[in-house]
């Protein structure tokens, strides 16, 4: 029945080619053999209309066998076998996840804080003399912003595949050190071409962090525990916005030290701090659950089992095949979610890169403008964490994404109007909070609804990589000549939000219809007592199209 449902999408040819080449290189490093057939499991055949009553005869045995056979690609010392997963009480399970949180989240959050700080501090540097000293005229400043996003978007998909080869504990800290060095060198640029060149290098170096960390977290946490972690991780971005304003205010007093203006010291000091964080991450970060020595063998088995059988009776596929790439590129939900992603990331980058300028045009001087960027980000961090917590508690994503979109709609509508500056500053709070608070939900939502490690990895990289081109657009819509109302800039942001308000209901309605139809097929099968056999391998290959998979709303 379900095989009769067909979806079509417009794909980006160059992105497919880049991903295909990356996958071919990946396969050279990771030859694999086909998994052996496991126990047969009675399930519903939603493609042919034949149904079967689920059987528990082999379920536990099959799960234990799959956990024991798990081979972790990319680890130096892979564990071929693991003990059967232990039975944990609710309190013991909470302690285990807390143990994992304390190991993973602090360093990942710190790394992303500096990542967002380093990409967005150019907005503060602009007020501290960057544009004047480098003689940037016309749209040169906007072009410098845009050139960051081009390699950042293009390299995100290949970077997620490379992560599996070089291991998270080496790849993520390594790129952190590299972009920290690039950021330090940005403080020494003397001309516009040098600034553009360094921004391009920064985009290349930072491309692998965000999609890599989100994919990495999806390998550790069940899907309805993911948004809170992504929220904690991404909360560093909003904290970075507040931190950037405070740092810029303080560093401004160093202007003239050793012949460098304040904008140079912003880049140099924050770049050096990033390098230190990257070096620290080499000693702290771990790889995959099956090779993590801070967990006991029983704890590793439980984490793998809990994640592997999350919303699936037979678990996810662990090996790579070219069809995973094809499935990700041709999946309707990836392309629909890209539009939803753009509806938030466009406003997010627009307000992040130009907030100091927008506030300055309210009539404040430079130091006060830097300080006034702090409260909106503090408010945004609070709203983000509230949204993330309740989204995981309710196991729903779209209501919180919708709330963020509506906040952006109201905030940008206020700022495009002739309202007094105090009212517009209130609108800024809504713009910042709405875009930042909705973002983790968008990322987690697609990750929840893509089944299979490699399909999820490629799909999420496409989602983030292509969606981030909205950031390139946002970096060009706030022009100096449009101050103080920035009608074009705020108008484009309202356009992005409008796209989201159209595509979000489409996704929700489609997911509901699919879930409802699968429930009906299940109910009819139980009533008729009809059976059909699928092997665990066949169910794993079906992934999120399997009859027992339910989409998160």
Regions found by a protein language model. Give the residues of each.
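Extracytoplasmic gate region of multi-pass secondary transporters
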Residues: 328-382
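Extracellular/periplasmic helix-loop-helix junction of adjacent transmembrane segments
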Residues: 123-152
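Helix-breaking motifs and short loop linkers at transmembrane-helix boundaries and internal kinks
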Residues: 135, 166-167, 188-193, 205, ...
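C-terminal ends and interior cores of transmembrane alpha-helices
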Residues: 178-190, 407-419
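Conserved MFS/SLC helix-loop-helix module at the cytosolic interface between two early adjacent transmembrane helices
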Residues: 154-189
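Intracellular terminal tails of multi-pass secondary transporters
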Residues: 2-6, 12, 19, 25-114, ...
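Central cavity-lining transmembrane alpha-helices of secondary-active solute carriers
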Residues: 146-159, 378-383
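Glycine-rich segments within core transmembrane alpha-helices of 12-TM secondary carriers
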Residues: 230-252, 274, 464-473
């Amino acid at each position: 029945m379900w095989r009769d449902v067909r979806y079509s999408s417009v794909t980006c040819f160059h992105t497919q080619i880049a991903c295909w080449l990356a996958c071919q290189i990946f396969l050279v490093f990771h030859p694999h053999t086909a998994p052996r057939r496991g126990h047969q499991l009675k399930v519903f055949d939603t493609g042919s209309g034949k149904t079967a009553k689920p059987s528990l005869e082999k379920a536990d045995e099959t799960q234990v066998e799959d956990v024991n056979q798990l081979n972790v690609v990319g680890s130096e010392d892979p564990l071929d076998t693991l003990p059967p997963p232990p039975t944990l009480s609710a309190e013991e399970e909470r302690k285990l996840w807390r143990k994992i949180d304390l190991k993973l989240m602090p360093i990942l959050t710190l790394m992303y804080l500096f990542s967002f700080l380093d990409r967005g501090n150019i907005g503060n540097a602009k007020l501290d003399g960057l544009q004047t000293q480098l003689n940037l005229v016309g749209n040169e400043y906007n072009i410098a912003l845009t050139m960051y996003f081009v390699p950042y978007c293009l390299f995100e998909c290949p970077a997620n595949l490379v992560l599996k080869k070089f291991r998270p504990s080496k790849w993520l800290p390594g790129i952190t050190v590299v972009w920290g060095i690039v950021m330090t060198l940005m403080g020494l640029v003397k001309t516009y071409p040098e600034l553009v060149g360094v921004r391009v290098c920064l985009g290349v170096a930072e491309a692998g962090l965000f999609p890599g960390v989100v994919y990495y977290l999806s390998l550790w946490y069940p899907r309805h525990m993911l948004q809170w972690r992504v929220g904690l991780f991404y909360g560093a971005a909003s904290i970075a916005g507040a931190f950037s304003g405070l740092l810029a205010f303080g560093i401004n007093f160093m202007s003239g030290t050793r012949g460098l203006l304040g904008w140079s010291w912003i880049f140099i000091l924050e770049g050096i701090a990033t390098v230190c964080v990257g070096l620290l991450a080499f000693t702290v970060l771990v790889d995959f659950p099956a090779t993590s020595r801070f967990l006991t063998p029983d704890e590793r088995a439980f984490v793998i089992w809990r994640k592997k059988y999350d919303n699936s009776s037979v678990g996810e596929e662990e090996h790579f095949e070219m069809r995973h790439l094809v499935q990700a590129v041709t999946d309707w939900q990836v392309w629909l979610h890209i539009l939803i992603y753009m509806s938030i990331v466009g406003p997010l980058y627009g307000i992040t890169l130009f907030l100091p300028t927008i506030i300055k045009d309210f009539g404040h001087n430079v130091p006060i403008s830097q300080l006034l960027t702090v409260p909106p980000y503090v408010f945004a961090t609070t709203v983000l964490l509230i949204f993330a917590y309740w989204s995981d508690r309710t196991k729903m994503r779209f209501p919180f994404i919708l709330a963020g979109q509506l906040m952006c709609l109201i905030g940008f509508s206020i700022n495009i109007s002739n309202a007094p500056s105090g009212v517009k500053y209130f609108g800024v709070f809504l713009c910042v909070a709405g875009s930042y608070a909705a973002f983790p939900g968008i990322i987690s939502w697609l990750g929840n609804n893509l089944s299979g490690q490699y399909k999820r990895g490629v799909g999420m990289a496409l989602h983030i990589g292509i969606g981030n081109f909205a950031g390139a657009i946002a970096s060009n819509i706030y022009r100096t000549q449009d101050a103080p109302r920035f009608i074009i800039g705020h108008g484009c942001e309202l356009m992005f939000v409008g796209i989201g308000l159209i595509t979000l209901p489409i996704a929700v309605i489609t997911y509901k219809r699919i879930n409802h139809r699968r429930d009906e097929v299940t109910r009819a099968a139980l009533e008729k007592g009809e059976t059909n056999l699928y092997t665990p391998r066949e169910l794993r290959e079906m992934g999120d199209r399997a009859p027992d998979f339910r989409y998160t709303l």
